Amino acid sequence: MSTQALSLHTGLSPLSPLGVLDRVGWWGALGMIAVALVYTLFMLLASRGAPRRSGPSHPDAPLLIVILMPCLNEAEVIGASVRRLTSIPDPGLRIMVIDDGSDDDTAQVAAQAGDERVEVVRRRPPRARLGKGEALNDALSIVRSRSTSVPSSRVIVGVMDADGRLDPHAISEARRAFAPQEVGAVQMGVRINNRFGSLLARMQDMEFVIFTEVFQRGRRRVRSVGMGGNAQFVRLSALDALGPRPWTRSLTEDFDLGIRLNATGWTNEFWSASAVHQQGVTSMRRLMRQRTRWFQGNLQALHLLRAVAREQRGLGRADTLWQILTPYLLLTGSLLTLSFLITMVTAAVAAVLRWEQSWAWLVGAYVIAFGPALVYAWIYWRIERGNGLGPLKAVGYSHLFVLYGLLPSVYGWRAVARELTGRTGWAKTAREAEPAQATESARSVSATVPPATHPAT
């Protein structure tokens, strides 16, 4: 709808103060949409190219890979996750399960792995339940004390969620990813296990696939890859560059870590050759709670702007600044969504009253809103067609994905309210137990923790 048409329906004169404000808002909205579309197009094109490589590779000295798995009441899922890791025949792999003061049998279930590569660390009050970052920092202190005979550049610290299932070849792929000396961190892809039985889980899977296939792959080109909380691998020497306790108390300590690593001169790499599989949230209420926490954590990253502007260069700096400012852009975008809904209502009223108007704007709005989604549909279909997804169904999912993408308009403002009122404490999101895991967790476990369990100090 043109600004003249809007003025006709609202009774505003184009030369009145409100009319001028209306036009400024209209063109401002178009400008924001144009910037978002150009950014998406740039990342889409960048993601199709090969990553930049410049540094020499390490010699064939072995890497020690230590997987840290922070857990709080994860008895339902931790057993299967540990078994999946111990099934990988890699003598240079170690698994450290961090029981962060659980009330259930998390430690006992993990300790039943029966593999000498598995260690259970128990955190007790008052050191327990201080956040994922604090749990990781305490575990890292143990890793450092145990690996003094190995150069820190040859020690890789991985982070996995308790419900994570790494691809069988993921550890060997991690070794390949860290061959270049400049690589300080590697993030693998994320897939949602239960996407076949839940539409909400399907949207989360599509979200992760689009994010990794377009934006993470594109960021390989500009050296601004972000880190996630699952299947994150970091060189110990890169963590050392961030100090003795590299993970912060941010609600999104993974995002925070990735930003700060990019500012140290190390290269963050995205590795698409393998992925971690996790359970998606199937309850809208729990999803909104989870995403509110993530959004609030991203809001807390604003203090990193100065370091990024000072330490990074070129397109990498520009994109990292974009990542930090994204939640604020989404909040502004939510106002555009509200404005569009008001415009739709105005147009509907005009149609009922038989006012003359052009509907060409509606076609343009559809192209702007759903055009990128059709590209996403093709990308997602290409990834999922081996699992029986047809192209028409992918297009249908892409339209639902646009509506799913409106959720930040709701939970974003909730996150702002929590941040402004100083509410930063969160209970973890309940896991979605798989049937096989639920059966196993019901089995009797020993009441005492085997000797393999190590208390954190």
Q: Predicted segment positions?
A:
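N-terminal membrane-anchoring/stem segments of glycan-assembly enzymes
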Residues: 1-61, 376-379, 408-419, 447-456
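Short, acidic, metal-binding catalytic loop of nucleotide-sugar glycosyltransferases
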Residues: 83-92
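Catalytic donor-sugar/metal-binding loop of nucleotide-sugar-dependent glycosyltransferases
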Residues: 258-276
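Long helical/loop segments within the catalytic core of UDP-sugar-dependent glycosyltransferases
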Residues: 124-125, 129-148, 152-154, 168-250, ...
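The conserved acidic donor/metal-binding loop of glycosyltransferases
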Residues: 161-165, 261
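A conserved acidic beta->alpha catalytic loop
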Residues: 99-108, 123-128, 165
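Cell-envelope/extracellular polymer assembly enzymes that use nucleotide-activated donors
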Residues: 63-66, 94, 256
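Membrane-embedded multi-pass helical conduit in multi-pass membrane proteins
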Residues: 57-59, 326-420
